[in-house]
């Protein structure tokens, strides 16, 4: 099997990709625990040559660039034009000269052999059509023994930040079918046995998964959190198609979930759960 990521490329270059680009700073705040855990697990340090897969708006890219300093390099790749544009803007604003962005599909991009010491990804590798093929192609891009660290979601039930608003609104919306557990999507790497199998079959070794549990700030105000949930993720399209009473009821149900998870400081937080996956190139 080979990768046909056409659907994902279309999706991330649609209005959805534009929305993620608009929320770049908020997303980095939400997922900062994952960023730190991935960079620590990869042991990114001064002088490293880093490849950032599915870099999105460049949050992990910029964080890695700070660690490698000017004598290291970070190459970042993503299929989303809107997010790559946003990432470049952010890198330019930070006067970074050791960062390169590539608008392309990492699954079959012709990286030169031995170009990198470290491979990192924050939530960017769960969308490959054929992940074993993708990781088999990526392996030679690292020096032998090069280290990979990936942040990937655990199961839906362990991620209330994503699922509780959906469950509350579902009775009032026409939701699309749930993807299968191994179909491309946010939870396709939730099964640790599958992750180990994919990486082992594609030539990686010393594979390990460590759990990361944390709280995700969906917004610093109730209004911000509600706007984020309505514009991003699985509820954005169904909410855009419904009108009248069902739309009102769906928004009321989402609001109730967010209110129940608002702290005394006004910040809306729900729990999230990831695997931090590490391995070495064969």
Predicted region positions:
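Conserved Class I S-adenosyl-L-methionine
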Residues: 3-11, 16-19, 23, 28-31, ...
